[in-house]
Amino acid sequence: EVPTSLEGIDAIADDLVNKGGAGEALSMGIYGWFFEQFICKQGLAYANNDNGRSAAATAVDFDGNGAALSIVSAWKDLYDKGYAPNVGVGGDAGLTDFSAGKAAITLGSTASLKQILNDVNGSFEVGTAYFPGIKDTDQGGVSIGGASLWAIQNQDDVKAQATWKFVEYLVSAESQAYWATQTGYF
């Protein structure tokens, strides 16, 4: 059974490393998007004012609501036990060890899946799962990532019509099929 949290990964990490032959239980780069997702998975806010929904965000909330402490504590615990070494900075930093078979688990966006499958090249089976929480009891979801698209409202009707035409093309079945197969995003 695939763990749904860092707590769950910790529970099986010894077996992954000592019985399963993985050098690392978890290979995860230091990356802001992961930090944001761990906050969301806890159901907590990144910024004040309802994450900027009730009023403009003016300060971070994660330093006062316990989210950051939970993330760093759980990750440091895995690091201190030798289960999750520091593999560097960036969203793809953890992929190298995973693709080489040195790590049992890595974190990433679906956008990384094509790269992982190409790198693994059939040398082992790759499975996917939902982004983990910190604790097994975390019930939050994840937030959107960098592949979101925004259209700015303005007073230029010609630009607005052109923008809408572009959006219609992007959401067409043909465009979405190409996007999903080429990037991993869905």
Kindly give the residue locations of the regions a language model identified.
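Short helix-loop capping/hinge motifs at secondary-structure junctions, enriched
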Residues: 1-2, 19, 45-47, 68, ...
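Short helix-initiation/N-cap motifs at beta->coil->alpha
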Residues: 4-10, 86-100
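Extracytoplasmic/periplasmic solute-binding protein
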Residues: 7-60, 103
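Glycine-centered hinge/linker elements that transmit conformational signals in sensory
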Residues: 12-14, 56-88, 131
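Short, solvent-exposed loop/beta-turn-alpha elements that line the ligand-binding surface or hinge
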Residues: 45-70, 118-120, 133-141
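Extracytoplasmic/periplasmic substrate-recognition and gating elements
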Residues: 81, 118-185
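Beta->alpha turn/N-cap motifs
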Residues: 91, 108-113, 131, 146-148
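Paired acidic/hydrophobic, glycine-rich loop segments that form the ligand-binding mouth/hinge
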Residues: 104-109, 127
